[in-house]
């Protein structure tokens, strides 16, 4: 039975049982910061379970797309190595919010699995687990379903910790929870059927878990205390791919109809003969291209944080496995096309076909970046290997390659294994783990104010005013609540109402003063933590007390320049959409009083001509003095109006819309002018590609533009004085200088090459012939690295069967090059020659079969030592015919 049919049957079954069929929700959870991705069918109903949302429908069934790549549900490392794990999967589920409970949930599951009309699975092959003190569930299975007692397994708490069991499900440390009953199906082939399964270990060995029924009947209010919920709920989950394994009678999810088609299509596309040992890599690539394609279709881009980092991790893991099977050029991006057909009959539309061009571009760019990192990282690894002793590499150095240069650990392992070099993987994992802890602690210190006990929320009232009479409701000094701040003390002040804008929407927070007749507090920055506006600064004069009535005054001049930059950012966003036929995706912005920075995703490049056009559009809108208005509405309504907003940002129910008439409309809670004319003027000062088709524009407005041109004018005048001409002629003069310089460099290279040819003639005349092999060993001076190689190549062209050793003295840095002609590479071992040299002059170096390069650990080389090396090498080469 094919996967599509199983899904359709499941939904039809529950439709007949009066369940409302819901579509799969997005892979990106809505209004839930606790999850990176949707990882279970119940995610979209979480608020109903938590009683934060009214239930319109009592019984629901879904087929939900899920991703499990981290945290409690981290399937990423298992993918390809086990038969049943993958990162993107479908979870079939039925849910009830008070309409039915344990008995019906169990009856429905049993009927769907075993009835002839539905899946018709063998009852003899089904085993059940239940929570040890859930006697109600036990009775239902034994007395109503009539399952054999030998097929019912009691699961206890782990380590005698109450409710810590595989059969007791929790939403979190606290909150809704309850016992569960799991359904397993006997899956071992080519063996006599095991008559009795008595433990969970045996279950996992012989059976496959196919369905988990969770009975949400408790609320955990402390670590040890749970109470009954007023209305119990049902939450069940059955992996579509897992049940497909059973119904299609195959070994693993990678042999089910959807995956087998994809894997075969991948084999054709990559045009590489896949060996049996590489099947794991092929499975990983097939899983990861599905997940990567769907995530990019959901507007997630590869990056270094959160969801973006997970996507990058998935892509790079697939690329590593591509590298292992011999794919050393971009290939992954081509595979995304296969997903269009592979996921055609999905129950959720990712719009892959419409977005395929964008998806391929993003994947291609990520691959190019990966191969650059790989090449650079491997070069650094080779250098490290050159200097190691006893074929053992330091774990800290491998960590640096991974953490600083991005070289994947798997590739380092493979490379070192080939070279018979070892390192302690457990020690390396410990270094990685400790580093992650350090980074987390740093981030907490930077971003988190959770160490402070906050009292009352503060209100922002500063969109149209610059000062406000306020009351101090809280003072924090050295992370503690205090009654007052005195002169020079650094601290945080919270007001009941404030005109200070806190850092948000890419805009920096306000600075200014909080003062009364007793003292002055200088506000250096304003931040927001939850609903508290924190004025961070120091006492300049006198003191400030709790409950004081104060005047809160923002830096008006600074605010106005920030407003200019923020309103200009909206004009820039709209102008970019006008220039490019395809829509751009805003990825972020930074706005202060000096400049604005705008990051956006776009497949196309901004030429110089387009940048000028962009500036003209924006400056014309500024000159027209267009009103800038705002309106408060619900996020739901705003989405229906197709208003621009950041795809990855979490918005509140109520949002603020900024309108620039007939040109721009965006969600934004930043501060703006009331008309475009107040921006003054606009100038782009930088444009670059910051990665993965993400472009960055840096621009200035108002007085900063005037200052920018004043500075340019000063430079122009200096150039005019220097060249005794006007600015219009300077470009031609500079061009002539550059061209002359190029010619001089070319002439210099010609002279150096001529010199190398002359040196080669002298060295050939000194070549020593021994045992039908030529040996040149000479000391040279001040020859560049590239030219030393060239000299070696010239010598090898002129003399067949040549061993050349060049010792180059280059201002206290003495390096060497050992090389042989190709016909000697299977006769003469260069490492042996290197060791002979090192026995006379200590040094380090390494390379290939035909060339070794390195350096000596001394400042000066005497000729008698070169003679000594020569004698030893002649003795060595005379051994070989």
Curated annotation (Swiss-Prot):
Q: Which InterPro entries match?
A: aa-tRNA-synth_II/BPL/LPL, Ala-tRNA-lgiase_IIc, Ala-tRNA-ligase_IIc_anticod-bd, Ala-tRNA-synth_IIc_core, Ala-tRNA-synth_IIc_N, Ala-tRNA_ligase, Ala_tRNA_ligase_euk/bac, Thr/Ala-tRNA-synth_IIc_edit
The note describing how and how many cofactors are bound reads: Binds 1 zinc ion per subunit.
What Pfam families does the record point to?
tRNA-synt_2c (PF01411), tRNA_SAD (PF07973)
The cofactors it requires, by name, are:
Zn(2+)
As recorded in UniProt, its EC number(s) are 6.1.1.7
Q: Where in the cell?
A: Cytoplasm
Q: Which GO terms describe its molecular function?
A: alanine-tRNA ligase activity; aminoacyl-tRNA deacylase activity; ATP binding; tRNA binding; zinc ion binding
GO terms for CC?
cytosol
Q: Which CDD domains match?
A: AlaRS_core
Q: Where does Zn(2+) bind?
A: 566, 570, 668, 672
- Keyword annotations of the record: Aminoacyl-tRNA synthetase, ATP-binding, Cytoplasm, Ligase, Metal-binding, Nucleotide-binding, Protein biosynthesis, RNA-binding, tRNA-binding, Zinc
As its record notes, the protein acts as a catalyst of:
tRNA(Ala) + L-alanine + ATP = L-alanyl-tRNA(Ala) + AMP + diphosphate
> What GO biological process terms does the UniProt entry carry, in alphabetical order?
alanyl-tRNA aminoacylation
The UniProt family comment states: Belongs to the class-II aminoacyl-tRNA synthetase family.
In UniProt terms, what function does this protein have?
Answer: Catalyzes the attachment of alanine to tRNA(Ala) in a two-step reaction: alanine is first activated by ATP to form Ala-AMP and then transferred to the acceptor end of tRNA(Ala). Also edits incorrectly charged Ser-tRNA(Ala) and Gly-tRNA(Ala) via its editing domain.
Which proteins does it associate with, and in what oligomeric form?
Answer: Homotetramer.
PANTHER family per record: ALANINE--TRNA LIGASE, CYTOPLASMIC, ALANYL-TRNA SYNTHETASE
Cite the domain annotation text. Consists of three domains; the N-terminal catalytic domain, the editing domain and the C-terminal C-Ala domain. The editing domain removes incorrectly charged amino acids, while the C-Ala domain, along with tRNA(Ala), serves as a bridge to cooperatively bring together the editing and aminoacylation centers thus stimulating deacylation of misacylated tRNAs.
**Entry protein name:** Alanine--tRNA ligase
Q: Which gene encodes it?
A: alaS
């Amino acid at each position: 039975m094919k996967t599509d049919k199983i899904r359709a049957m499941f939904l039809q079954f529950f439709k007949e049982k009066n369940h409302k069929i819901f579509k799969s929700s997005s892979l990106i959870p809505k209004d839930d910061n606790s999850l990176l991705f949707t990882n279970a069918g119940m995610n979209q109903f979480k608020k109903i379970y938590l009683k934060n949302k009214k239930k319109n429908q009592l019984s629901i069934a879904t087929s939900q797309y899920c991703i499990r790549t981290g945290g409690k549900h981290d399937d990423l490392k298992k993918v390809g190595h086990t038969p049943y794990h993958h990162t993107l999967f479908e979870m079939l589920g039925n849910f009830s919010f008070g309409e039915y409970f344990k008995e019906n949930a169990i009856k429905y599951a049993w009927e769907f699995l075993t009835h002839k009309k539905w899946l018709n699975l063998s009852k003899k092959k089904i085993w059940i687990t239940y929570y040890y003190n859930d006697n109600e569930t036990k009775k239902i299975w034994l007395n109503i379903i009539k399952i054999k007692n030998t097929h019912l397994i009691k699961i206890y708490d782990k380590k005698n910790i109450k409710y810590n069991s595989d059969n007791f499900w929790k939403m979190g440390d606290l909150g809704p929870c309850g016992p569960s009953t799991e359904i397993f199906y006997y899956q071992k082939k080519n063996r006599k059927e095991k008559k009795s399964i008595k433990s969970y270990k045996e279950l996992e060995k012989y059976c496959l878990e196919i369905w988990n029924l969770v009975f949400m009947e408790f609320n955990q209010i402390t670590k040890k205390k749970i109470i009954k919920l007023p209305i119990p709920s049902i939450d069940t989950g059955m992996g579509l791919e897992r049940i497909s394994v059973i119904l299609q009678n195959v070994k693993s999810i990678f042999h089910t109809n959807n995956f087998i088609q994809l894997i075969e299509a991948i084999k054709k596309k990559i045009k590489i003969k896949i060996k049996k040992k590489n099947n794991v890599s092929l499975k990983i690539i097939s899983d990861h291209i599905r997940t990567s394609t769907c995530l990019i279709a959901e507007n997630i881009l590869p990056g270094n944080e959160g969801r973006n980092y997970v996507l990058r991790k998935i892509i790079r893991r697939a690329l590593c496995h591509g590298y292992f099977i011999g794919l050393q050029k971009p290939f992954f991006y081509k595979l995304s096309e296969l997903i269009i057909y592979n996921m055609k009959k999905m129950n959720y539309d990712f719009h892959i076909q419409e977005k395929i061009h964008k998806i391929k571009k993003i994947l291609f760019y990520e691959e190019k970046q990966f191969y650059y990192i790989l090449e650079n990282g491997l070069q650094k690894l080779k250098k490290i290997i050159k200097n190691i002793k006893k074929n053992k590499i330091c774990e800290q150095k491998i960590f640096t390659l991974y953490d600083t240069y991005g070289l994947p650990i798997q590739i380092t392992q493979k490379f070192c294994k080939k070279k018979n070099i070892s390192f302690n993987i457990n020690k390396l994992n410990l270094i990685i783990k400790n580093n992650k802890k350090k980074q987390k602690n740093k981030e907490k210190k930077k971003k988190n104010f959770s160490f402070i006990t906050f009292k009352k929320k503060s209100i922002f009232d500063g969109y149209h005013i610059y000062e406000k009479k306020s009351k101090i409701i809280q003072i924090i000094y050295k992370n503690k609540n205090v009654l007052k701040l005195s002169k020079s003390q650094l601290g945080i002040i919270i007001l009941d109402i404030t005109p200070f804008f806190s850092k948000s929407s890419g805009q920096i927070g306000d600075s200014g003063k909080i003062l009364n007749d007793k003292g002055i507090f200088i506000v250096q920055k304003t931040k927001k933590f939850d609903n508290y506006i924190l004025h961070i600064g120091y006492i300049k004069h006198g003191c400030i007390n709790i409950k004081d009535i104060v005047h809160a005054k923002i830096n008006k001049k600074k605010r106005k320049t920030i407003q200019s930059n923020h309103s200009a950012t909206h004009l820039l966003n709209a102008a970019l959409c006008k220039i490019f036929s395809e829509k751009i995706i805003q990825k972020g912005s930074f706005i202060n009083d000096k400049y604005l920075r705008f990051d956006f995703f776009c497949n196309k490049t901004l030429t110089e001509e387009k940048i000028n056009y962009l500036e003209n559009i924006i400056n014309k809108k500024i000159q027209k003095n267009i009103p800038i208005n705002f309106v408060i509405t619900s996020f739901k309504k705003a989405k229906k109006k197709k208003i621009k907003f950041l795809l990855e940002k979490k918005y509140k129910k109520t949002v603020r819309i900024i309108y620039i008439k007939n040109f721009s409309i965006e969600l934004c809670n930043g501060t703006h002018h009331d008309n475009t004319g107040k921006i003054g003027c606009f100038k782009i000062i930088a444009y670059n590609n910051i990665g993965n088709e993400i472009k960055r524009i840096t621009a200035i407005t108002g007085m900063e533009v005037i200052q920018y041109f004043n500075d340019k004018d000063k430079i122009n005048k200096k150039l005019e004085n220097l060249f005794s001409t006007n600015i219009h002629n300077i470009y031609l003069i500079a061009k002539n200088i550059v061209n002359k310089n190029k010619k001089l460099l070319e002439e210099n290279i010609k002279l150096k090459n001529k010199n190398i040819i002359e040196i080669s003639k002298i060295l050939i005349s000194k070549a020593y012939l021994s045992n039908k092999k030529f040996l040149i060993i000479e000391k040279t001076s001040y020859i560049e690295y590239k030219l030393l190689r060239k000299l070696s190549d010239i010598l090898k062209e002129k003399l067949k069967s040549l061993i050349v050793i060049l010792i180059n003295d280059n201002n206290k840095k003495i390096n060497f090059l050992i090389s042989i002609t190709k016909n000697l590479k299977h006769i003469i071992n260069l490492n042996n020659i290197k060791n002979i040299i090192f026995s006379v002059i200590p040094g380090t170096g390494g390379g290939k079969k035909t060339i070794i390069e390195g350096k000596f650990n001394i400042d000066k080389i005497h000729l008698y030592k070169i003679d000594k090396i020569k004698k030893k090498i002649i003795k060595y080469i005379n051994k070989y015919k």
